Regions:
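Substrate-binding/active-site clefts of carbohydrate-active enzymes
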Residues: 1-46, 60, 64-75, 79, ...
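Acidic-and-aromatic substrate-binding clefts and catalytic sites of carbohydrate-active enzymes
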Residues: 56-62, 87
């Protein structure tokens, strides 16, 4: 089915919340199945014991929970985490996305904390803004 695996905007254009090209439509059943079966293959065949999802926020919560559940059926110690944000807007509603704001809805799926990273080392996009480890005052509470 043309366009099935990629998320599109209401006008039919492809969405690019990754800023790297088309984003996958993880909320569609066959795309979800493809993602789950792919990680299961890697876990079984290559004994991968952890999976990191770059820009996890482009994926929906249900898919990320399905990934973690399937992996934990193989081995409960397999670690799943990702970046809980996107690099652009997406037609998938925020309430359905695997964002940091929705981490409580992710069953055993962790989200990387850019807040702690930036508090410790300084803002990732502002090299002149030091973090706690470089002596910037007032950050002690943000890195606890």
């Amino acid at each position: 089915v043309p366009g099935y695996y990629y998320r599109q905007r209401p006008d039919g254009s492809f969405s690019d919340a990754s800023a790297c090209g088309n984003e996958t439509a993880s909320e569609r059943p066959m795309m979800r199945k493809y993602i789950v079966e792919s990680v299961l293959y890697w876990a079984r065949e290559y004994h991968i014991d952890g999976f990191r999802f770059d820009l996890m926020g482009i994926h929906d919560i249900e898919t990320m929970n399905a990934v973690t559940k399937a992996l934990h059926e193989i081995d409960p110690s397999i670690f799943v985490y990702g970046e809980g944000w996107t690099a652009g807007s997406s037609p998938l509603p925020d309430a359905q996305r695997a964002l940091k704001a929705n981490v409580a809805q992710l069953d055993a799926t962790a989200a990387f904390s850019d807040d702690i990273r930036d508090g410790l080392r300084g803002h990732v996009f502002t090299p002149t803004d030091p973090g706690f480890v470089s002596g910037k005052p007032g950050l002690a509470e943000s890195v606890k």
